[in-house]
Amino acid sequence: MITLQRTPLFDVYAKYGGKTIDFGGWELPVQFSSIKEEHEAVRTAAGLFDVSHMGEVEVKGVDSLAFLQRVVTNDVSTLKVGGAQYTAMCYENGGTVDDLLIYKRGEEDYLLVINASNIEKDYEWLASHVIGDATVVNVSSEVAQLAIQGPKAEGILQKVVSEDLKEIKFFKFKNDILVDGIPALVSRTGYTGEDGFEIYCKSEDAAKLWEKLLEVGAEEGLKPCGLGARDTLRFEATLPLYGQELSKDITPVEAGIGFAVKPNKEADFFGKATLKEQKENGAPRKLVGIEVIERGIPRTHYPVFIGEEKIGEVTSGTQSPTLKKSIGLALIDVKYAAVDTEVEIEIRNKRVKAVVVPTPFYKRSK
């Protein structure tokens, strides 16, 4: 029997009604109340997520920048201390190793945040390509991560932080902030399409912080949220999930995150030739939004057709809690990717009519 990994918050899930599932080898809460309720809380008030299963890797040393420039697609040289950057790591053929965040904590000090399912693979990938005076250390077990997301997130977090959170702009962070007396890195980032913060602290401090935030946020409607709502929220905002929109067979350009690929940077990074070609001349496939016109919900790997020709497949799909529509993301032949193109999705051996629609499905009003 496989023993599932647990985050430092596992013991407090039950107190808040958490229902756990096996998520890539981790025992994590899929929901606390209901996915719909938690989803709506984040869109209208605020939600608190345990994201401690994510991986953290420290990269330090004189050659840390040169090393990162070689292994990621974005231009890390543009990052200033206190800044965060979204990027990807690719194989030589352009397929994706992982998507990740890089935090620049010092001139020779970077924190990489990687997907839970890829921690070992990513660490080995990074370690095998180290150059010069750069060190790569997996600190995942020492670090916990909480995400507070939603329009009321700032006001709630401000109650337990003395620094003015308005000073932390989007994709910026402050290190060594005290959150209710607990040292943490606080960044204005997230995976929901809403404003919010991600808080990195020592594993042993996570449970205390979780309970304190839920206590001070109760009045504003802060709810504990599970993986179910995290997925529907990121999906509506058209944020890719590794293993679905991104994989070793899908490039960042195909997946719609070409903005994180900088083929004109000087460094010769893995996948550069393929990604440069795709950015300049277009990729053969494109990730598009689809709305199902008839009954049925598109799910991962459901085939997409025009007539008898299979043109691609669904990567993610759901009944959108915000839009009240059955929608999906599909990776299809670029020839058919224009908005308003009529397609069919095979749902349980039956062809169902759908149409290509613009993405993101949801964008918050500023």
From Swiss-Prot:
InterPro entries: GCS_T, GCS_T_bac, GCST_C, GCV_T_N, GcvT/YgfZ/DmdA, GcvT/YgfZ_C, TrmE/GcvT_dom1. GO terms for biological process: glycine decarboxylation via glycine cleavage system. The glycine cleavage system is composed of four proteins: P, T, L and H. Belongs to the GcvT family. One of its GO terms (molecular function) is transaminase activity. This is Aminomethyltransferase. SUPFAM superfamilies: Aminomethyltransferase beta-barrel domain, Folate-binding domain. It catalyses: N(6)-[(R)-S(8)-aminomethyldihydrolipoyl]-L-lysyl-[protein] + (6S)-5,6,7,8-tetrahydrofolate = N(6)-[(R)-dihydrolipoyl]-L-lysyl-[protein] + (6R)-5,10-methylene-5,6,7,8-tetrahydrofolate + NH4(+). Its EC number is 2.1.2.10. Keywords: Aminotransferase, Transferase. Disulfide bonds: none annotated. It holds the Pfam family GCV_T_C. The glycine cleavage system catalyzes the degradation of glycine. GO terms for cellular component: cytosol; glycine cleavage complex. The keyword Phosphoprotein does not apply. The keyword Acetylation does not apply.
